[in-house]
Amino acid sequence: ALFLSNRDLQIGRGEPVQDTARVLSRYLDGIMIRTYEQKEVEDLANYGSIPIINGLTDFCHPCQVLADLMTIREKFAVLEGLKMCYIGDGNNMANSLIVGGLKTGMKVSIATPADYRPDAEVMAFAEPNPNFFITDDPMKAAENADVVITDTWASMGQEAEKDCLLYT
């Protein structure tokens, strides 16, 4: 394993991601990246020749959700048919929980303020599914839930809104 921070790479200092992806592909067998922008992960995957694992972006947090789903399965022995409730803003965790939960046959219930809904593309995937429910009422969302998940009050990119979010 090799850890490289943004200080170790030239991406933020003008080097095109295409060049970085090609060079890293010569040295490594795979990359797990935690970054802010989803596009950075997609660009690495497009220009590199090795597997890219999304460790975290502003759009999704798939590794965390895989770990959460594994933990739920360890506790209940199954995922299909369980009701999972998420209470929080429609952030990367909400996006990943919606997709992961629905793809494993879970009922997914989300409570989030109207101004902080999940990504439109994720909503377009989820809304036709009868196992998906979204509301701004946490009590309705949590009703009969087997699992309730929450997240940080202020997500990546919302640092300026943190105080406001804590008091609404």
What are these regions (language model features)?
Residues A1-R73:
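Phosphate/diphosphate ligand-binding glycine-rich loop within oxidoreductases
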Residues K75-V78:
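Glycine-rich helix-loop-beta junction characteristic of Rossmann-like nucleotide cofactor-binding loops
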